[in-house]
Amino acid sequence: GNRFVIIIDEWDVLIRDEAANKIVQEEYINFLRGLFKGTEPTRYIALAYLTGILPIKKYKTQSALNNFLEYTMLNPGKMAPYIGFTEAEVQAVCAAYQKDFQEVKRWYDGYLLGNYHVYNPCAVVNLIFQGTFQSYWSQTGTYESIVPLINMNFDGLKTDIVTMLSGDAVAVRTTTYQNDMVTFKNKNDVLTALIHLG
């Protein structure tokens, strides 16, 4: 028979917005697990496509989902050119809307995923519609959630952030991050969260 295609945009909104509410988070993860985990769902679901900022949350040692491919800022795989606008796409937009590509690059070239320079689509689209260069990302809820992270008192965190803001690279160990917005044991966990938040 017919099977469904399920699309969940911002799957992680409860993980981010209810960061301190473990009960809501666990109920939500259990809901996702019941919806997608195991072989039974393949009888009625052809494809599930979930978007979000954070990787899929794990409880204990088990992921909420199995039989899925996960692409993240840390491991974009073949999806790297689809996570944002590529440089070629931004050049085409700049040509179509008479924007200085070098200035757009200076403002919005935020990611290097594999071999791709990837731009934040929200920022580029806002530039086209608003007509002015500014930090559109700082007007989002995500921006508000990073301020407490930056202010955490982990040894060397603020120094590393200043180093990155000046254009230099900082090594980050990403293996201990718990894929949530409350479990931070060291500066590497905070920096990993910041990577996922963009």
Where are each of the predicted segments found?
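Phosphate-binding site recognition
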Residues: 1-198
